[in-house]
Amino acid sequence: RPSWTVDSDSAKYSSFLDSLREEFGRGTPKVCNIPVTKKANNDKFVLVNLVLPFNRNTITLAFRASDAYLVGFQDRDSKTNKLRANFFSDEYRALSGKYKSIFTDAEVLAPALPCASTYTDLQNKAGVSREKLSLGVSSLQTAFTAVYGKVFTGKNVAKFALISIQMVAEAARFKYIEDQVINRGMYSSFEAGARITLLENNWSKISEQYHKSCKLGGGQFTEEEMKLGLLLYN
């Protein structure tokens, strides 16, 4: 299982993202030498451990294997000391019944999280747009600490989700985002801005263009789009 100790070691961060890309692409032929996600409608998930360096607290993120979307996470409830499985409100009905097959060491199923998994709802609950949200190691550490073992609010869950999605899944999809985290987010924080969110919003379309251009040749891509780390199955 890919694991990242959330600190300022950029080489380990890159290695973590490479192993995550390979995990998403396992069993699917590469296209243009880029890993490709699983076929849609399969019931598989990719789990990732985020570990805080100063106390070894661990949050396990669960991403759908077919599209790298975050569906929930596991942490340890500070009141009961039990590992709890947490799913977003829009995923809860479909996934809560099989939480033990997703988070195999979870001891309890928590109620649905107070937000949905969509960027729209997460931004509303966090009270900040993705463009203006601070990304970086210290931002992720702070957001992690605000949810780990705590009583969940829409705000603390949404902020943690927005930061971890962009620094994990979106950075796996786009090496340009990985580079931005390494260059601007290891020792300070930065706002994603419009260039990053434009890439995030168009991953499906860019993936489709890659599939076509790798078969037929040609294809026009921006410098940022050229640095693709993971393709959506086509």
Swiss-Prot record:
A GO molecular-function descriptor: rRNA N-glycosylase activity
UniProtKB keywords: Disulfide bond, Hydrolase, Plant defense, Protein synthesis inhibitor, Toxin
Protein origin, superkingdom: Eukaryota
InterPro entries: Ribosome-inact_prot_sf, Ribosome_inactivat_1/2, Ribosome_inactivat_prot, Ribosome_inactivat_prot_CS, Ribosome_inactivat_prot_sub1, Ribosome_inactivat_prot_sub2
Catalytic activity of the protein: Endohydrolysis of the N-glycosidic bond at one specific adenosine on the 28S rRNA
Cysteines engaged in disulfide bonds, as pairs: 32-115
EC number(s) per entry: 3.2.2.22
Active site feature: 170
Any coiled-coil regions, as ranges: none
GO biological process: defense response; negative regulation of translation
UniProt key word Hydrolase: yes
UniProt record similarity statement: Belongs to the ribosome-inactivating protein family. Type 1 RIP subfamily.
Function: Ribosome-inactivating protein of type 1, inhibits protein synthesis in animal cells. Inhibits cell-free translation in rabbit reticulocyte lysate system with an IC(50) of 0.17 nM.
PANTHER family to which the protein is assigned, alphabetical: PTHR33453, RIBOSOME-INACTIVATING PROTEIN
Record's subunit section: Monomer.
UniProt-recorded name of the protein: Ribosome-inactivating protein lychnin
Taxonomic lineage of the native organism: Eukaryota, Viridiplantae, Streptophyta, Embryophyta, Tracheophyta
